[in-house]
From Swiss-Prot:
Organism: Histophilus somni (strain 2336) (Haemophilus somnus)
InterPro entries named among the record's database cross-references: DNA_mismatch_repair_CS (IPR014762), DNA_mismatch_repair_MutL (IPR020667), DNA_mismatch_S5_2-like (IPR013507), HATPase_C_sf (IPR036890), MutL/Mlh/PMS (IPR002099), MutL/Mlh/Pms-like (IPR038973), MutL_C (IPR014790), MutL_C_dimsub (IPR042120)
Name of the featured protein: DNA mismatch repair protein MutL
GO MF annotations, alphabetized: ATP binding; ATP hydrolysis activity; ATP-dependent DNA damage sensor activity; mismatched DNA binding
Signal peptide: none
This protein's GO CC annotations: mismatch repair complex
């Protein structure tokens, strides 16, 4: 048989085999189009499990008359225009395959009107021929897509559809997943003219929590822990079930990457690992998690259904999620009784920063292009940026754990006021003298200077403390503990060494072990494999640091430790509270032998010269 180019109709039907698996796939693709169009109210009407009719109506921006033909064409889209756009997907859809694939296996009618048009227009396409005709229609601003007789021209595929009840259950699950990610959008779902769900638009945090309770159940919310975990451009937020209330079925796990529902093995493994010490193999965790990260760091163009993603730094993502989950599961948190939308509303304590309250869409390229960062990353290209916060825009200060709150209360207390309890972290420290020592001569933190140093006072003397030196000292103290907290790597780091580096490794292997590193040594091939590392170094470029330490051997552990700390890199601290928090954590690790070392970090300020100039 000779090689031929397939006819467009056949190519579309092949594509439909990947995109349109069942009626629920059609519903998912059409709702994502509505969301990309900026819809705030979406109606879903289903007949006979979606086999006979799927009708999606929205109040989005609509499609212009002269673009209706293109809307049904394959690889026609308004969401990307170049390879650069493909590297940074901000919308839910982007391939331009859905409508063409759906129309090739059904009778599809698309009716739409934009705000600039006085009347609506309707386009109809049917089956393999996909010939379209446009006629005037009556319709408000927005779009309605009707998909009738799905798989009417592919009997083999229609035969494999399950019962109406089963197919509708899949559709219902799709709606639930999307409704969790888009609280600001109202959804109405009917089946055979019977109202099944009505999710009202959720504006306040209380309303959004109630939507989660409505979808996941009151039992879940009453026994769930709130998680809010950040590291650089990564942000993990949502709710996780307490281990003692884990489920016997793996049926309540919702995970979203930048607002897109996904199923990813890296994420699943990190979550299971965090729960591993609490759950048996017969129990499953329940969670609703939102992961926000730079879109350049994740590839969503992996599978036609877009359920699968690929991370550029999978190990970093895994470790970040694992640490966030572990922190949530081990922290003390108060359960909040929640009532669903159908119940009488009860006053609910407002959580800190789950949702972004402003989620309107801008532009066509960015249709659903709501970016997920509260602040733009330093290495991000500003010229190509259309970043807008996804969940982080209205974040207030993250509520600290009770232990941290107690520490701050003690820090802010004077000798006469140590019985006063504080439950909240002050936002302004400009005029607060912060106690950081239990010595008779109390040392006070007064201000953060240029994000580089803390101004401290002791009696009538003033000192500067370098933030970088404090960060290094903090790590040094953690690495000198007798029981160093370690983290197992999902993917061990394999290092092939030259002869000189391997000799250096043999000389310093004990030093690495004392510092909390766990290596496997293959002397025959001069290879070492890092299996575990100190948790305090998990955000560092550890491979680079190890090689730097091996390039210059150190004979004493103290010298080794100093060299290790000198290679560390830390993000700058932007607020006074962060600096005080770091100082607090450092002081909590103090012993008598560390006092002199800490004092050596202080630079005394002599004011006489400056005061003389004022006279």
């Amino acid at each position: 048989m000779t090689i031929k180019i397939l006819p467009p109709q056949l190519a579309n039907q092949i594509a439909a085999g990947e995109v349109v698996e069942r009626p629920a796939s059609v519903v998912k693709e059409l709702i994502e189009n509505s969301l990309d169009a900026g819809a705030t109210h979406i109606q879903i009407e289903i007949e006979n499990g979606g086999a006979n009719l799927i009708r999606i109506r929205d109040n989005g921006i609509g499609i212009a008359k002269d673009e209706l033909h293109l809307a049904l064409a394959r690889h026609a889209t308004s969401k990307i225009a170049s390879l650069d756009d493909l590297e940074m997907i901000l919308s839910l859809g982007f391939r331009g395959e859905a409508l063409a694939s759906i129309s090739s296996v059904s009778r599809l009618t698309l009716t739409s009107r934009t705000a600039q048009q006085n009347e609506a227009w309707q386009v109809y396409a049917q089956g393999r021929d996909m010939e379209t005709s446009i006629t005037p229609a009556s319709h408000p601003i927005g779009t309605t897509v009707e998909v009738a007789n799905l798989f009417f021209n592919t009997p083999a595929r229609r035969k494999f559809l399950r019962t109406d009840k089963t197919e509708f259950a899949h559709i219902d699950e799709v709606i639930r997943r999307i409704a969790l990610a888009k609280p600001q959008v109202a959804f109405t779902l009917t089946h055979n003219n019977k109202l099944i769900h009505r999710y009202k638009s959720a504006v306040t945090n209380e309303q959004k929590i109630k939507r989660i309770a409505t979808i996941c159940g009151n039992d879940f919310m009453q026994n769930a822990l709130h998680i809010d975990w950040k590291h650089n451009d990564l942000h993990l937020s949502g709710w996780v079930i307490q281990p003692q209330f884990a489920r016997h079925q793996n049926d309540l796990n919702y995970c979203y990457i930048n607002g897109r529902m996904v199923k990813d093995k890296v994420i699943t493994h990190a979550i299971r690992q965090a729960y591993s010490e609490y759950l048996s193999n017969e129990k499953y965790p329940a969670f609703v998690l939102f992961i926000d990260l730079n879109p350049n760091e994740v590839d969503v163009n992996v599978h036609p259904t877009k359920h699968e993603v690929r991370f550029h730094q999978a190990r970093l993502i895994h470790d970040f999620i694992y640490q966030g989950m572990t922190n949530a599961l081990t922290s003390e948190q108060t359960n909040i009784p929640i009532q669903s939308e159908q119940s009488n509303p009860t006053k609910v304590a407002e959580p800190q920063g789950i949702w972004n309250l402003t989620t309107h869409n801008k532009g066509n390229r960015a249709t659903a292009g709501k970016n997920i960062f509260a602040q733009q990353p330093k290495d991000y290209d500003k010229k190509s940026s259309q970043f807008k916060p996804h969940f982080a825009a209205n974040y207030s200060e993250v509520t600290p754990k009770k232990a941290v709150q107690k520490a701050y209360a003690e820090l802010l207390a004077t000798h006469e006021e140590k019985t006063i309890a504080s439950s909240t972290l002050p936002h302004q420290f400009t005029h607060n003298a912060t106690h950081i020592s239990e010595q008779k001569n109390v040392l006070h933190a007064l201000a953060l200077i240029e994000n580089k140093a803390l101004l401290l006072q002791q009696n009538q003397q003033y000192f500067l403390l370098s933030i970088q030196a404090l960060q290094h000292f903090n790590i040094r103290l953690q690495l000198q503990q007798s029981n160093i907290a370690q983290q197992t790597l999902l993917i061990p780091i394999l290092l092939r060494l030259n002869k000189q580096q391997y000799q250096s490794w043999q000389q310093q292997a004990l030093f690495f072990q004392q510092s909390g590193f766990d290596f496997t040594d293959n002397s025959a091939q001069r290879r070492i494999t890092l299996n575990r590392l100190p948790i305090c170094l998990r955000t560092q470029n550890i491979q680079k640091i190890i090689l730097q330490l091996l390039d210059q051997p150190h004979e004493k552990y103290t010298i080794f430790l100093t060299a290790l700390c000198s290679h560390l890199e830390f993000p700058s601290l932007s607020t006074f509270s962060e600096a005080v928090n770091l100082l607090t954590k450092t002081e909590q690790q103090f012993s008598t032998q560390h006092q002199l070392e800490f004092q050596s970090l202080l630079v005394k300020i002599e004011w006489d010269h400056y005061l003389d100039k004022l006279q």
